[in-house]
């Protein structure tokens, strides 16, 4: 991986990126496109690969579909993809997540959980992510992400990805998001333009469950 530029992106409303009044997959995609174009101009990068987990996979596939000339390789990791005819009016988005503040960092770190809920044997990785997912404010400690984002996020309803670059879909063998007919439906929609690879003993958070395996898969795929 020498001579390779790796950019780890915090999408708007997540990590250390700022909050916005409105969020959409399309807006997330425009942010990634801007980064790619900047890399091409500032660093002369011509070979662009995008790797996205979960929601990040949707953003990656959207960019690869809308700006085909910019993306050379696409990897999606355990990304839930709805069929184009999915009707959001028939599904309840759940209650609003309320902003909470905690008096001590130790207390909020003890509250850290994976969603969807799953066990993870790599406690060291969990502790690292939890420690980098919180910030201190005047009101106390809180999670970095915008609590209101997922209740207002404009998703890609009625949209089918049309990327034509080499693409790989990695999924956990025990992933709740791939259970039932979900994975088969994704394969039915995209097996003609995307390869699929299962990671044994991994749930939805594949990079946490099997970090070394994910690294090997990505390296073997891209380098």
Predicted segments, located by residue:
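Catalytic histidine-centered segment of alpha/beta-hydrolase-like enzymes
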Residues: 199-211
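Gly/Ala-rich beta-loop-alpha elbow adjacent to hydrolase catalytic centers
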Residues: 52-56, 60
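Conserved serine/cysteine hydrolase catalytic core
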Residues: 135-189, 195-198
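Active-site loop/oxyanion-hole signature of alpha/beta-hydrolase fold enzymes
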Residues: 5-51, 216
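Post-His helix in hydrolase/transferase enzymes
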Residues: 208-220
């Amino acid at each position: 991986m020498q001579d390779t530029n790796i950019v780890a992106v915090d999408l708007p409303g997540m990590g250390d990126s700022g909050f916005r009044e409105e969020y959409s997959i399309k807006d997330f995609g425009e942010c990634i496109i801007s980064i790619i174009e900047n890399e091409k101009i500032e660093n002369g990068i011509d070979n662009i690969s995008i790797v996205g987990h979960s929601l990040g996979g949707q953003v990656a596939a959207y960019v690869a579909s809308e700006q085909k000339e910019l993306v050379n390789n696409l990897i999606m990791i355990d990304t839930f993809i709805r069929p184009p005819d999915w009707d959001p009016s028939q599904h309840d988005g759940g209650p609003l997540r309320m902003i909470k503040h905690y008096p001590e960092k130790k207390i909020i770190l003890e509250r850290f959980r994976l969603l969807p809920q799953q066990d993870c044997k790599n406690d060291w990785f969990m502790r690292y992510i939890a420690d980098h997912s919180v910030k201190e404010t005047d009101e106390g400690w809180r999670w970095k992400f915008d609590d209101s984002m997922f209740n207002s996020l404009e998703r890609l309803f009625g949209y089918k990805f049309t990327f034509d670059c080499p693409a790989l879909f990695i999924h956990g063998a025990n992933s709740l998001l791939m259970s039932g007919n979900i994975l088969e439906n994704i394969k039915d929609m995209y097996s003609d333009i995307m390869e699929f690879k299962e990671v044994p003993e991994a749930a939805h958070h594949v990079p946490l469950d099997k970090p070394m395996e994910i690294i090997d898969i990505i390296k073997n795929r891209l380098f």
